[in-house]
Amino acid sequence: MSSVPASAYLTLAIILFCIGLFGALTKRNTVIVLVCIELMLNAANLNLVAFSKLGLFPNLTGQIFSLFTMAVAAAEAAVGLAILIALYRNRTTVHVDEMDTLKG
């Protein structure tokens, strides 16, 4: 049984992170930016799992930390979407360009 090399995991994580970074920097829709940030967090989680599984001293620390990070990311996404819904009700848009003032 052959295992996947560590370089494949790291390459996939780099590709996912770059796609998320590109989307977060270029898109103007706040929902898409939030999804791209979640994609970058998942790329970091993939690195944690890959290093904990394929490192010099394999242990479960990276995998447990990855689960903790996923729980925090889920809470962050829920709070972010709640803020976006409130902003949409206030301003009827979710574009980043129109959210530059703090006026209510």
Curated annotation (Swiss-Prot):
Membrane-topology annotation of the record: Multi-pass membrane protein
Full protein name: NADH-quinone oxidoreductase subunit K
Gene: nuoK
Name of a matching Pfam family: Oxidored_q2
EC numbers, comma separated: 7.1.1.-
Keyword NAD included in the entry's annotation: yes
GO molecular function: NADH:ubiquinone reductase (non-electrogenic) activity; quinone binding
Record keywords: Cell membrane, Membrane, NAD, Quinone, Translocase, Transmembrane, Transmembrane helix, Transport
Compartments it resides in: Cell membrane
Record-level GO BP terms: ATP synthesis coupled electron transport
Main location: membrane
GO cellular component: NADH dehydrogenase complex; plasma membrane
